[in-house]
Amino acid sequence: MAELADAPDLGSGARKGVRVRLPPPAPHKNGGKNESRGSGQGSLFKALTVEIQGDSVKEKIDEMYKQLQKTVQIQGFRKGKAPLWIVRAKYKDYVEEEVGKKIADETLQKALEEANLKPVADVFLEKVEVDEKEGKVKYVVSFEVAPEFELKDVENLEVEVPKIEFKEDYVKEELERLREANAVWEPKDENEPAQEGDMLVVEYEVEEIGGEGEKVKQETSVILGQGMLRPEVEEALKGKKVGEEVELKELPLYDQEGKEVGKVNIKIKIKEIKKKVLPELNDEFAKELGYASLKDLEEKIREDIKQKLEKLKEQVIEERVADKLVEIHDIPVPQTLLRRELSFLVDRRLRELQALGIDTRYVDIKKIVEEVQPIAEANIKLRFILDKYAQEKGIEPTGEDIEAQYKELAEQYGTTVDEIKKYFKENNLEQVVYEDARRKKALKEIISKVKIKEVEQKQEEEKKEEKEEVKNESQGNT
């Protein structure tokens, strides 16, 4: 499902340049001349040229020279005693660059408002020119803006969702899951080969090819068949016995964007192979879990599943409506937002793998990027759609809506509501919470108006297959 919440800014950008903050505009003295011009109207990338002229520019330049005069050490003079004209000659380029950046910081927000431009992500300072004599600063910034699009008739959609019903088989499946969770690992005979589902205790040595030739030697545990290792590593380990070694030469490494960043040689020695042993399903097992009997355990499971199915219905409806909204709108995605979203999703996937005890240095990052890119694009499109709907319908979150959003964040990050509020306030992120709460409210409003049609699971699968066939045929004809 496309996600409503914005990905945090991890500092990624689509182009090189100086990242400019967007603080409140600073006042200018003596009616200084300010001028801004925007360009690039046919693209999401925009360039804005801003000219600032007045006494405030001259004052900032003079002030910086005087500060430097007091602090810099110039050969032939004691600290703070060099003539101002020498300081000006030596540090002219530095002062002009720093003053230009400072004035860009102070004036950019006002310039953007005058040009009626709203960046959706990072703003890059591409060029700064300072004329000390005229007291003039001219700078150029580039950034991306939100795409313009027409909102479709989202309130009269028909959305199909799979029919979700309680089945007694779910209780049996949960009991099996509990058995799996309470299983024990017992050593296999040394002559038995490793197979899928086995836990391997291995000692591995990784040697970087080229560079500094760094070597890493560690011991870890992995379960074959759970995607904890790259496919080629898993295949090499299958069928091996305790004491045997495998070697993989020139294995490529990838960064978070899927680009190859180097190669390594890996040597793995199997120290132990363990098999999973499941407990018997009886009253004794139920008592170990805190229930009087197996019957009591089954009843509790049944009750919990029914509650979860109700929540699942709501979640599936949200997902299908969100997917439908994205499907019916053709919206270009700003590349700066896409890079940020990709970085966030890849990082989150890596943290999930780390939580499972997986060494993410050898995970196929390129594959993860390919998997999450459609999700990243859908997330961004959905936010634009819900923002536009909320704006057109005048939807605003209440205090209760915002409080609920903070509560959800606190649960997500395993902390208190007060701590979350403190963090968002200190980092000037309160507007992000407000916008996420507004999007959530907009989606609920849309869901209340669309027609929800429940279909049997079999029909659902058949329609998915039909869509996939149509997609493949269209790709084959292009």
From Swiss-Prot:
GO terms for molecular function: peptidyl-prolyl cis-trans isomerase activity; protein folding chaperone; ribosome binding. One of its GO terms (biological process) is protein transport. It holds the Pfam family Trigger_C. One of its GO terms (cellular component) is cytoplasm. Consists of 3 domains; the N-terminus binds the ribosome, the middle domain has PPIase activity, while the C-terminus has intrinsic chaperone activity on its own. It is found in: Cytoplasm. Its EC number is 5.2.1.8. Residues 197-279 form the PPIase FKBP-type domain. Belongs to the FKBP-type PPIase family. Tig subfamily. The keyword Repeat does not apply. Keywords: Cell cycle, Cell division, Chaperone, Cytoplasm, Isomerase, Rotamase. Involved in protein export. Acts as a chaperone by maintaining the newly synthesized protein in an open conformation. Functions as a peptidyl-prolyl cis-trans isomerase. Residues 1-41, 455-478 are annotated as: Disordered. The N-terminus of this protein overlaps with a tRNA(Leu) encoded in another frame on the same strand. Its main location: cytoplasm. Residues 455-472 have a biased composition (Basic and acidic residues). This is Trigger factor. PANTHER family: TRIGGER FACTOR CHAPERONE AND PEPTIDYL-PROLYL CIS/TRANS ISOMERASE, TRIGGER FACTOR-LIKE PROTEIN TIG, CHLOROPLASTIC. It catalyses: [protein]-peptidylproline (omega=180) = [protein]-peptidylproline (omega=0). It comes from the Bacteria. The keyword Transmembrane helix does not apply.
